[in-house]
Amino acid sequence: MAEQKSSYGYEELLACGRGEMFGPGNAQLPLPPMLMIHRITEISETGGAFDKGYIRAEYDVRPDDWYFPCHFQGNPIMPGCLGLDGMWQLTGFFLGWLGEPGRGMALSTGEVKFKGMVRPHTKLLEYGIDFKRVMRGRLVLGTADGWLKADGELIYQATDLRVGLSKEGSAQ
């Protein structure tokens, strides 16, 4: 497993996407264009809203990002599900960073609120994930609340984001 650091750059996140960070069969980020994170600015096993750990990350929005031309033609908006997926990506990364074994999968979320949009003129997305608990059993399960800011304005909130790590590779 890679050294446990408190921040990660883009090349390190790509290495995680190739399965090189946490070892074969363990937590892995998606590769571009589905990778919704450009850097992890802070990660800690303690602190956060529930004092169970947190992660902060950023994504640089570009006017030519792949989703703008198709969602929607003449009215470009980043699909909200991509921001939500970024929250799940970070939740899974945290579990791998803790050294937990298994392949990651998004399982569910509680409530999701969309209060704004990501447009081509948006410059920076900031993610915040605050962990409520990590349960270790047959499946390692991380539960967290998350938020997303666009150029400093809170636009998405999600409660009870759940990501599991399974040694078998599925949640079943």
UniProtKB/Swiss-Prot annotation:
The keyword Isomerase applies. Pfam families: FabA (PF07977). Its EC number is 4.2.1.59, 5.3.3.14. GO terms for biological process: unsaturated fatty acid biosynthetic process. CDD domains: FabA (cd01287). Its main location: cytoplasm. This is 3-hydroxydecanoyl-[acyl-carrier-protein] dehydratase. It catalyses: a (3R)-hydroxyacyl-[ACP] = a (2E)-enoyl-[ACP] + H2O; (3R)-hydroxydecanoyl-[ACP] = (2E)-decenoyl-[ACP] + H2O; (2E)-decenoyl-[ACP] = (3Z)-decenoyl-[ACP]. Necessary for the introduction of cis unsaturation into fatty acids. Catalyzes the dehydration of (3R)-3-hydroxydecanoyl-ACP to E-(2)-decenoyl-ACP and then its isomerization to Z-(3)-decenoyl-ACP. Can catalyze the dehydratase reaction for beta-hydroxyacyl-ACPs with saturated chain lengths up to 16:0, being most active on intermediate chain length. Homodimer. The active site is at H71. InterPro entries: FabA (IPR010083), FabA_FabZ (IPR013114), HotDog_dom_sf (IPR029069). Keywords: Cytoplasm, Fatty acid biosynthesis, Fatty acid metabolism, Isomerase, Lipid biosynthesis, Lipid metabolism, Lyase. It comes from Brucella canis (strain ATCC 23365 / NCTC 10854 / RM-666). It is found in: Cytoplasm. Pathway: Lipid metabolism; fatty acid biosynthesis. One of its GO terms (molecular function) is (3R)-hydroxyacyl-[acyl-carrier-protein] dehydratase activity. The keyword Cytoplasm applies. Belongs to the thioester dehydratase family. FabA subfamily. GO terms for cellular component: cytoplasm.
